[in-house]
A protein has these predicted regions:
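Flexible "arm" and connector segments at domain edges
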Residues: 1-65, 71-197, 201-263
Length: 263
């Protein structure tokens, strides 16, 4: 048994210590054997749960989920500390130096008249810092682990900053029509369907960007709408003493259309 001082309230240093103890030879056998890869999914899940707490404006839940995200950060740093490569102090040192460098208008003699001017300056300094000499370098640096729609939006935005973009939303919609026609042809031919579907999704993201709509938010909203309507359809079937599995597609479509009218 490990003795850990119990307190009415714990702080950052306590979190570092408990993670260290959990990974120690006397600690938890599960925690000791974890690797970056084995807990990678957990880190993503905690980040998404924190995002959901933000979306629902739930302060109590956000406090909990931010703690879970921080635990993941400390755990990953603990793995590296055990390997002798870096620790949490190195992580904090790096991010503080980054913030100092990318805020010359606060910690130096740079100028930023409005909040709108800051992102462009941040991006320019980021590219200098990472040695991205061309726009292609910046595009290639967009994380491949991002959700596809999110990655597409970031890539398009960086390309647009270099002047490569459609004139307006009408031109973007025309491109979407073109890509949709190519997808239809690919489906008929039975070839290149994945590539053409990707082109349609990429073009759809472009339309959303012109309209100021976040594609991930949009598709998640549609998912929620689908769930609501499906639930209404299922409840309508149950009210008739029936199950969806016993109904024809035409019968389910009629219930679906009724659910659409009510939502």
């Amino acid at each position: 048994m490990i003795n850990f001082t119990r307190k009415p309230r714990y702080g950052y240093e306590d979190l570092l210590e408990i993670i260290r103890l959990l990974r120690s030879p006397e600690g938890c056998p599960w925690d000791r054997v974890q690797t970056h890869q084995s807990i990678r999914r957990g880190m993503l899940e905690e980040a998404y749960e924190a995002a959901e707490a933000i979306d629902t404006d739930n302060a109590a839940l956000l406090k909990e989920e931010l703690g879970d995200v921080l635990m993941q950060v400390v755990f990953h740093a603990g793995i590296e500390a055990d390997a002798g490569r870096f620790d949490m102090d190195d992580v904090c040192d790096g991010v503080v130096k980054k913030l100092l460098y990318r805020h010359p208008h606060v910690f130096g003699d740079g100028q930023a008249e409005t909040a709108d001017t800051v992102p462009a300056s941040w991006e320019q300094l980021k590219r200098q810092e990472k040695g991205q000499k061309t726009t292609a370098d910046a595009l290639d640096a967009v994380a491949r682990s991002l959700p596809g729609l999110w990655r597409a939006e970031k890539i398009q935005k960086k390309a647009a900053e270099a002047g490569f973009d459609w004139r307006d939303v009408s031109a973007a919609l025309d491109k979407l029509d073109e890509e949709t026609a190519e997808l239809r042809q690919a489906v008929r031919d039975g070839t290149n369907v994945e590539e053409e579907l990707g082109d349609v999704l990429f073009a759809t993201v472009k339309v959303g960007r012109f309209c100021g709509v976040d594609p991930e938010t949009a598709v998640n909203g549609t998912c929620e709408k689908f769930i609501r309507r499906f639930r209404a359809m299922e409840e309508a079937a149950a009210a008739e003493g029936r199950s969806l599995s016993d109904m024809t597609l035409e019968e389910m479509t009629a219930l679906w259309n009724g659910a659409k009218e009510c939502s």
